[in-house]
A protein has these predicted regions:
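N-terminal amphipathic alpha-helix/helix-capping segment at the start of soluble metabolic enzymes
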Residues: 1-25, 266-270
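Catalytic alpha/beta core domains of metabolic enzymes, predominantly
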Residues: 12, 17, 130-232
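Glycine-rich, proline-tolerant flexible connector loops at the mouths of alpha/beta enzymes
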Residues: 53-75, 234-244
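C-terminal alpha-helical cap/extension of soluble enzyme domains
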Residues: 208-209, 213-270
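Catalytic beta/alpha-barrel core
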Residues: 53, 70-72, 88-100, 109-122, ...
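Alpha-helix-loop-beta-strand connector modules within alpha/beta enzyme cores
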Residues: 66-93, 127-133, 185-199, 245-268
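Active-site mouth loops of central-metabolism enzymes
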Residues: 21-39, 62-70, 90-94, 114-115, ...
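Catalytic domains of carbohydrate-active enzymes, especially glycoside hydrolases
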Residues: 39-56
Length: 270
């Protein structure tokens, strides 16, 4: 365990974390179809995203599925691989069960441990043993101490390429009846006082509300985030999952320009 005076720097698929660059993860919540993920990969790569995100395996709050929902699972992983190769963009996707690790590791550059599995220590341990970089999302009811403890389960396996991702906490008041979480930007500097690991912020899941994505993304840069994860979809209102939170390509392009303009103020780049 390194001193907190030290900040880890490492590269994943040629992209540096922990330095001046603030890498951007972008893509749909769910890999809905081959055509959709190829369209997204093409556009976000052209706009400047560093990683393609998309879930082939999706944990939902309720087991009920809308007519639009189709968990693509093995096919989704295959389509992510096709998009990765065609548009030369690295991939992050969630792993929910240990048995799917070999298949997912063939495609993913980063394994995402979702918030609901933040304290699934056997899963974290198994994922860490693959030596693939991990992103561990903070559970919406967990303390900073719990979150860092989850990361330690990966670190003790000798896997030092660990990203931590803040994606909102559950509080009594979230400013909108449709919002479930509050983005805890205070945790970014707080975590940086206690850990050497890079801190990524996910404003999309935290706000659950498209109009707030811009301001919370800009604020994430201002507070010292080491990466930003954004939900981007070609037709947000018809997204199969969480249609209130994705932004479209035009909005993403505009936001990327705004992020690039303010990053130098805090000594960073996009």
């Amino acid at each position: 365990k390194k001193s907190t005076n030290h900040k880890s720097k490492f590269k994943i698929a040629g992209v540096e974390f922990g330095g001046d660059l603030i890498p951007i993860f972008a893509g749909p919540n769910m890999v809905e179809s081959k055509d959709l993920i190829l369209d997204v990969a093409k556009n976000i790569r052209q706009i400047g995203a560093h990683f393609l995100r998309g879930g082939a395996f999706k944990p939902l709050t309720f087991p009920y599925r809308s007519k639009k929902y189709n968990e693509t699972r093995e096919d989704g992983i295959k389509w992510l691989g096709i998009a990765k190769e065609k548009y030369d963009i690295p991939v992050i996707t969630e792993v929910m069960e240990e048995k799917f690790l070999p298949m997912i590791c063939e495609v993913a550059d980063i394994l995402q441990i979702g918030s609901r599995n933040m304290q699934n220590y056997p899963l974290i341990t198994a994922a860490a043993k693959t030596k693939k970089p991990l992103m561990i999302k903070r559970h919406y009811g967990s303390s900073l101490r719990d979150w860092l403890g989850a990361a330690e389960y990966a670190l003790v396996e000798g896997n030092e390429k660990i990203l931590l991702c803040e994606r909102g906490v559950s509080v009594p008041h979230t400013h909108r009846s449709t919002s479930r979480f509050l983005l805890d930007l205070q945790v970014v500097p707080a975590a940086q006082e206690m850990t050497h690991l890079p801190i990524v912020v996910d404003p999309s899941h935290a706000t659950f509300w498209r109009p707030w994505i811009k301001s919370m993304s800009l604020a994430s840069v201002a507070c010292g985030a080491d990466g930003i994860m954004l939900e981007v979809h070609p037709d947000p209102e018809n997204s199969a999952v969480d249609p209130l939170q994705p932004i479209d390509f035009k909005s993403f392009k505009k936001l990327m320009k705004q992020l690039a303009s303010i990053a130098p103020i805090v000594g960073r780049t996009i």
